[in-house]
Amino acid sequence: MNRSTISPVEARQQFRAGLIQPTSGWSAGFAQANLISMPQDLAYDFLLFAQRNPKPCPILEVLNAGETFGGIFGSNATEADIRTDAPQYRIYAHGELIDSPASAVDYWRDDLVSFIIGCSFTFEHPMVQAGVPVRHLEAGRNVPMYETSLACRPAGSLSGNLVVSLRMIPASQVADAVRITSRYPAVHGAPVHIGDPSLIGIDDINNPDFGDAPLSEPSDVPVFWACGVTPQAMVMSSKPPLAITHAPGHMLITDAPDLGFQVP
């Protein structure tokens, strides 16, 4: 199975049928997205949190309370279901992780408002096309992600620290990586930090908070991008009564072409 050539519809069908795999490298050319669903009485607070923290929380679409599909799935919107079409989910109750199911249907409520947030997996295909290596993608692994010491701007009852994803980039190609990804602001855009991880509160780069440990070559430099797992750090810090998210690295694959998020 060549996961890069599978259509978004086919990918969602496989995940709906129970396949659990990180989605880096799937359905090349199409945008991937983070998900968080929260009770309606917290929806404004999260919308404000995202507006105040656009690097980690670039909103692609907001669904009405109880809605389970959106326009980002294009002509296939009614076929899609955000409760089943990511490979794996995380269920939080009062900030505690209580389950990591392959389907969120059993936890769904009609008062949940869902936010679909841009994901950096979207710009990995353009990086590869430009000859910039993406180590975890080459190895079929999940991207490493870390909670930093950098506080997000709070909103209402919601607060938490920035989460970043790491890609080890050859020093000679860091400028290329910055140039390419800066053209995709709706999916986190340019890096937020390059170099020494300790400067953003990461003590051990080989022990990520989410995902797999990084792979690197001797000439590589650590490059960090804002990450859509930041809302999960916010959930663990703010302890809302219920939140449904994707599992880190296990994204919703949309029908939106990645070039649609590229700016000049």
Curated annotation (Swiss-Prot):
It comes from the Bacteria. Gene3D superfamilies: PSTPO5379-like (3.40.1640.10), PSTPO5379-like domain (3.30.2040.10). InterPro entries: D-Glu_cyclase, Putative_hydro-lyase, UPF0317. It comes from Corynebacterium glutamicum (strain ATCC 13032 / DSM 20300 / JCM 1318 / BCRC 11384 / CCUG 27702 / LMG 3730 / NBRC 12168 / NCIMB 10025 / NRRL B-2784 / 534). The keyword Heme does not apply. PANTHER family: D-GLUTAMATE CYCLASE, MITOCHONDRIAL. Belongs to the D-glutamate cyclase family. This is Putative hydro-lyase Cgl2544/cg2803.
